[in-house]
Design a protein with these regions (language model features):
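Conserved beta-strand signature within the Rossmann-like core of class I S-adenosyl-L-methionine
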Residues: 64-72
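A conserved beta-strand element that flanks and buttresses the S-adenosyl-L-methionine
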Residues: 38
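Short alpha-helix
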Residues: 91-107
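Class I SAM-dependent methyltransferase SAM/SAH-binding core
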Residues: 1-27
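Short catalytic micro-motifs in class I SAM-dependent methyltransferases
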Residues: 41-42
Length: 133
């Protein structure tokens, strides 16, 4: 699921076996709930990403299902802090790791874990957060 038709078309070119949906993530619901939702570099493009976390928890995941989120744009990753200005993408939200963890907790996720992958120099790495419904 992606809000960009260009990304959907690219995915279809690279992988003809699976189904892809172009939709606003806050409006879309799967026909059947799933066990795993993985997202990379998406959540901070939402004005209120906590609403998306709640929506996935309530409408996409089975009981015991897992959300896995990866983002590079977060406060502790200093080189990413000026992306909003560098890219002129005004909707990018910058939050701390603790704020992202609070979004998961508030939605109801349990067994929440977080870590950074790919740390190198000033680059703090991709922040990965996962939790279970």
């Amino acid at each position: 699921v992606d809000g960009s038709i260009q990304m959907i078309e690219k995915a279809k070119r690279l992988d003809k076996k699976n189904n892809y949906f172009c939709s606003d993530l806050l409006d879309w619901n799967p026909k059947e709930k799933v066990d795993i939702v993985h997202s990379m570099e998406v959540f901070y493009y939402f004005k209120k990403p906590e609403i998306l976390v709640n929506h996935i928890y309530n409408n996409w995941l089975n009981e015991g299902g897992r959300l896995i989120m990866g983002i590079d744009h977060y406060k502790e990753n200093k080189p990413s802090n000026n992306w909003k200005e560098e890219t002129s993408i005004s909707i990018m939200q910058l939050f701390s790791e603790n704020t992202w963890l609070d979004f998961f907790k508030t939605a109801g996720f349990v067994n929440i874990e977080s870590w950074c992958f790919g740390k190198e120099g000033e680059w703090n790495g991709t922040l990965i957060i996962t939790g279970i419904k």
